[in-house]
Structure formats: C-alpha cells, structure tokens
C-alpha cells in the first residue's frame, strides 16, 4: 500500500436536510455557507482510495514555521502503553514563540517524572518528525471533558500559563 498522500483538503457538504442558515447568526452563516455548500472545517487526506480525518482546520498549530495537527500527535501518544489519554495544545512561551504542550493522563500506577517525559518524547520522535514532538508535558489525573464527553480544550487553554524554560517540565 502506498503511503503517499494524494489529496488533502476541507470537507464541504450539501443535502436536502442541510439548514439554509444559522438561526440569528448572520456572521456564522457567512463564514460557513458557500452557495449550496456547507464548509465543515473538517480536514481530510485521501490515501489509497480512503479519506482520513486529520482534524479541524482551526486546530492547526504552527510550530517553527511548520504546521502540526494536534490529533496526529495525540494519536501517537495514545498508542504508548503508559498513556491513558492526552490532549495536545498550542502553548505560548514567555518569548512569544509557540510550542506544543501535551497534557497527559497516565494509566494507574505510572508516575509522572522526567524519565517518563523523556520516554514519551522519544516515542513521538520515533514515529513522527521531530518538530511534532511536544516541548512541554503536563501530567494530570484527569483530562477535562465537555458535556458530550469530548476533551474540553477550552478548559485546558484557560488554565495554561506561559512557561519560560521547558527543561524537565512536568507538573
């Protein structure tokens, strides 16, 4: 099977059950509706005749001039046997540069440590290009969720603070 990405882009949909506009939200309607088509903001890549979800277009993070899909890094981290679940966010350092921050909930019995951070960082680097490896790691007991059970990224972002130095960071 070929690993070459043939096409990538944003999904547009239309159909008989599509709403013609957002209720009392002309701004949202203008951003989303393209004639008869609805801009979903969901990015996909076609590979070997299948379409793979990459993430939301507005989730893309630019790190050192390179675009990173948080979902790709999350999938890689979630494959590590010590990780219960995780979220990857953009984090602004005090010098205004952006860095990837992995918020990790470890499985029961695994302790957060500098060695654990090094292990997870090396795991990501062994599967993804080095710039996709998070610089910052934060360990939490539980990842906050929305009412629908999705990761509450806004809650994670709100509690995030700029960090000067990333050496050995874990909390």
Language-model-detected regions and their locations in the chain:
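Glycine-rich active-site loop/lid that clamps phosphate-bearing ligands
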Residues: 11
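AMP-binding/adenylate-forming catalytic domain of the ANL superfamily
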Residues: 126-150, 168-171
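AMP-binding/adenylate-forming catalytic core of the ANL superfamily
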Residues: 15, 20-21, 28-31, 41-132, ...
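Catalytic tyrosine of NAD(P)H-dependent dehydrogenase/reductases that use a Tyr as the general acid/base
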Residues: 22, 38, 149
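Short, small/polar residue-rich loop motifs at catalytic or cofactor-binding pockets
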Residues: 38-40, 138
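Acidic/polar alpha-helix N-cap and adjacent early helical turns
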Residues: 158-171
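Short, small-residue-biased leader/transition segments that mark boundaries at the very start
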Residues: 1-5
